[in-house]
Amino acid sequence: MKTVFNRKDIDFSKEPMFFGEDNSVQRYDVFKYPVFDKLNQKMIGYFWRPEEVSLQKDRGDYAEFRPEQKHIFTSNLKYQTLLDSVQGRGPSLAFLPYVSSPELEGCIVTWDFFETIHSRSYTHIMKNVYADPSEVFDTILNDKEILKLSLIHI
């Protein structure tokens, strides 16, 4: 049975990447797979917050769009929001139950976190461009074209 903390003293440098002992103390000083720690550090270096970006110009630009441009812009936001809603939780749900490498576990959690930032960035755009972002959010799951396109990737 999977546990969130294994009390055994385990040498994870001798464990397989998947299907080994459940993880215990998160150690980031000794690695069997150092590439995952390097990837994790690289991802952390790209940290940003969507709110740091002013969208005042974008709001004005959107107001000047023709109807077909607004449709393309909004459809893209719907599509990206749907995909990153999956990607923001997918890697952890799919892989963490089977991971036995602390460095890979950390890399997957960071990956999920950054996908969530992407998703939050689409919310930030919608809150700044549309008078009522709910009008966009509430139509994502009713948009047959967006759903059809997303099924290719989900």
Predicted regions and their residues:
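Conserved small/polar residues in nucleotide/adenosyl-binding loops
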Residues: I152-I154
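Long, K/E/R/D-enriched contiguous segments that form extended
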Residues: I140-S150
